[in-house]
Amino acid sequence: MDGQRYRVLISNKARQMMKAHVSFLAEVNPQAAEKLRVSLMEGIRSLAQMPERCPYLNEEDRRSPYRKLHIPKWYLAIYVVVDDTVYVEYIVDARQEYGWLLR
């Protein structure tokens, strides 16, 4: 098992996206929103170990360095690994269209 630990940085855009997802849910179910917030942060923190375990965002075109981490139930953290740092760029709801990320 790879013992290397990576530094995980969350972009302002990803933070805004996460806040929007949690805030939207909080309007109807504050407890579920808090669970979502915790789940998102746990998933993102897990990238400190073996971030390469996750698939590429676009498996057909690996020229793009972006990878995706599925965070139950419906979210994806989109990130790139550069040296010993993981840069989380986006947090998207996988039920919605996110093909614009592939362009």
Locate the predicted segments by residue.
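Enriched for short, Lys/Arg-rich terminal
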Residues: M1, I71, Y75-R103
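Hydrophobic pocket/interface hotspot
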Residues: A14, L40, L47, V88
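Residue-level recognition of specific faces of alpha-helices
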Residues: M17, H21-F24, G43-S46, K68, ...
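Generic structural signal for secondary-structure transition and capping sites
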Residues: P30, R45, Q49-R53, W74, ...
